[in-house]
């Protein structure tokens, strides 16, 4: 396939040397590292034979750092220095972190990404995640017997630019060469598609510890295409734990619990949730700091009932993602379950009822993402055979665009565009003699900038002064395979250029992620009306300004009545532009145009006479 001759990031030109590359699933609850051995993707285990590494980091006062199982053991005895589920904090501010009251950490909200105070000083989520990646990298090098060429690291499909960049920064800090960031649902499709040689449309239902992603993928003749994605970056297995934890507090009449009791009971809730996967009921026993004992039993049905609202939160994205892909549940050939939380029977039951078929579970849902990442890493490292060629096409989940005059959004890269992608549009100046232009890059589906998310701002200076509308400024958007955006602006006649690499200070809030697509659909009618009105208002402003300028320059061409007529039309248009009906504003613009027709003709004649003055007929070039 000719397209595959283009080198991916990190891919070597040496075709016959096997390079050591791994796939890493950097998870909220657990992380894994996998590689391809003898053509088969396998997860790499530690010296104790354990594949899964708990995503937990503990900082000691003496400078030691523990990662994984040993760190998890200290969660109840040293909670402030034992950091769990750090993935939920990546690229986020304190106000974006859910269930803060249930966490024992000493957060510092210093603007930008949240920080945590430990006995080894203030740590960022990037630094904490880097420790997990270091441990996985060391495990891989010990298992494979040499240094790694690079790694493919998976991220939730709904991670925004800040969260993706934070992941790449953590890998760099850990000494890993990132071949590519890969969306977790896409990684699962890679594993299932290659292992089972299946073709068709698949839904990837990924409910991990801290995030929920749903993707619709089309697998056909070696091409993996993501048709649409949706999800919730703040919904996962941790939320099921928290709901059961609240149930325990209510049943045991514990109010309010101490920090130690909260941690102990949250751990018991997690253990009970896991037991209910295979059992009809689970005991919950714990001794509180007051010496009071908690002795409860929760049934599978009770747990299903108390968490039904969480299951329901996954249903709306499922309907939305199918609508985006132009499909119905009956068009889906199979449903791939990803993430440990999908082991819950009532989750599998809800998915089966929605799609009318039993979901696929023949690969370990905890390992499938790492396996797919390993297969992709093997390809990018240049280890694939010719017959193994396939193309992977990810998509961008939210539209990218620019603010135009009047606070309108001009979408440059529409959502669900295949990555990597480059798109460009030309813009022009609004005023005569304009020598600079400010650009505001936004993300979202709404028509007005105020309803979208601001990503970055930059300026292009040095534009040659021209009349309004004469300058040509080409703005190019480039989104790479990792979903990271760069924007450049170039004035075509002079070549002056400015650019920006979009690295937002922190990620989308939970509410923004959950509502941006929903609001785009719900407000489409209002948005289109608002856009039409604002477009006419901007045009009215332009026409009024141009006419006023013309009166200042060439008002002598008019008699008093003619000038008064034009001034009345200007005043009427100003009044109409303050209204809320775009059709009426448009009529006002047309009325002013009619009132100035004769004036425009005289100005043109006057300009021609001025240009010809002092020249002979034979001197004029046609």
From Swiss-Prot:
Residue ranges crossing the lipid bilayer per the database entry: none
InterPro entries given in the database record: ATPase_NBD (IPR043129), Heat_shock_70_CS (IPR018181), HscA_NBD (IPR042039), HSP70_C_sf (IPR029048), HSP70_peptide-bd_sf (IPR029047), Hsp_70_fam (IPR013126), ISC_FeS_clus_asmbl_HscA (IPR010236)
Gene3D superfamilies the UniProt entry points to: 1.20.1270.10, 3.30.420.40, Actin, Chain A, domain 4 (3.90.640.10), Substrate Binding Domain Of DNAk, Chain A, domain 1 (2.60.34.10)
An MF annotation (GO) of this entry: ATP hydrolysis activity
Presence of the UniProt keyword Cell wall biogenesis/degradation in the record: no
Coiled coil, from the record: none
Gene Ontology biological process terms from the UniProt entry: iron-sulfur cluster assembly
Keyword annotations from UniProtKB, A to Z: ATP-binding, Chaperone, Nucleotide-binding
UniProt keyword ATP-binding present: yes
UniProt xrefs under CDD domains: ASKHA_NBD_HSP70_HscA
Family: Belongs to the heat shock protein 70 family.
Function according to Swiss-Prot or TrEMBL: Chaperone involved in the maturation of iron-sulfur cluster-containing proteins. Has a low intrinsic ATPase activity which is markedly stimulated by HscB.
The protein's name in its UniProt record: Chaperone protein HscA homolog
Organism: Aromatoleum aromaticum (strain DSM 19018 / LMG 30748 / EbN1) (Azoarcus sp. (strain EbN1))
Name of the gene encoding the protein in the UniProt record: hscA
